[in-house]
Design a protein with these regions (language model features):
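N-terminal amphipathic/basic-hydrophobic helices that include classical n-h-c signal peptides
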Residues: 1-13
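Terminal, compositionally biased segments used for targeting/anchoring and flexible tails
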Residues: 5, 15-229
Length: 229
């Protein structure tokens, strides 16, 4: 299987082409040695991960099935999970208060496990707009939002949003009134942030499911606001 890259106006698209014909047979227990792909050389850390994983399995400290299940759980983490939590807080003031006071407990009761790290929920209001960044790397509440977007990890965003947040927000189409304070929060290795956006006007008659459908990932990072299209 070869990964082919092609340039487009939106960046690089990855397509797969299978030009490796398997004309030879494999024994059931046969293992291929790790080989570098054309576009993805095996780095030191990838080799170390593979070696440690194989050693743990060999020593019966963990099974391949347990690793697979954990990867599936990680892959299931998507922004829609966070959107459901936000929508619930808009519909239920008691849950909202719990979410702000003790996010881990509230989210666990809602049905998601956010792990051992500290999570702080930042509520946007008419007077304060919160936006999240990780200036050092890409720390991000992956348990409820999935993987961070590429722009969140970029050096440009990480360096500019702390210096000129309003300008950066404008580039996302978000114009914050000068009467509203913009606060930038820097995530760390042991602490993450989740923005609780303001509920959009005109959504009073909407159901919790309908509200959740309005909430995008970027609003929970703080670079956009939630609106009714």
């Amino acid at each position: 299987m070869k990964i082919g890259w092609k340039k487009s106006r939106k960046g690089f698209d990855m397509s797969e082409t299978d030009d490796h014909e398997h004309t030879h047979q494999h024994d059931p227990g046969h293992k291929h040695p790790l080989q570098p792909d054309q576009d993805d050389t095996i780095t030191y850390f990838k080799a170390m991960e593979a070696a440690v994983r194989d050693l743990l399995i060999e020593k019966d400290l963990i099974t391949a099935e347990q690793i697979r299940v954990k990867i599936e759980q990680m892959d299931a983490r998507v922004p829609a999970n966070g959107a459901k939590i936000i929508a619930k807080s808009w519909m239920d003031d008691e849950f909202k208060n719990k979410l702000i006071e003790d996010p881990r407990k509230a989210i666990r009761e809602f049905g998601y496990d956010i792990g051992p790290l500290r999570l702080i929920v930042l509520e946007n209001t008419e007077r304060v707009h919160n936006v999240v960044v990780c200036t050092l790397c890409s720390c991000y509440p992956r348990w409820i939002l999935g993987l961070p977007p590429d722009w969140y990890k970029s050096r440009e965003y990480r360096s500019r949003v702390v210096r000129e947040p309003r300008e950066v927000l404008k580039e996302f189409g978000t114009h914050i009134s000068l009467d509203t304070e913009v606060r930038v929060h820097d995530s760390t290795a042991d602490m993450r942030y989740l923005v609780l956006p303001m509920r959009p006007k005109g959504s009073e008659s909407m159901t919790e499911e309908e509200l959740a459908a309005l909430i995008g990932r970027d609003a929970m990072i703080g670079v956009t606001e939630v609106s009714i299209l």
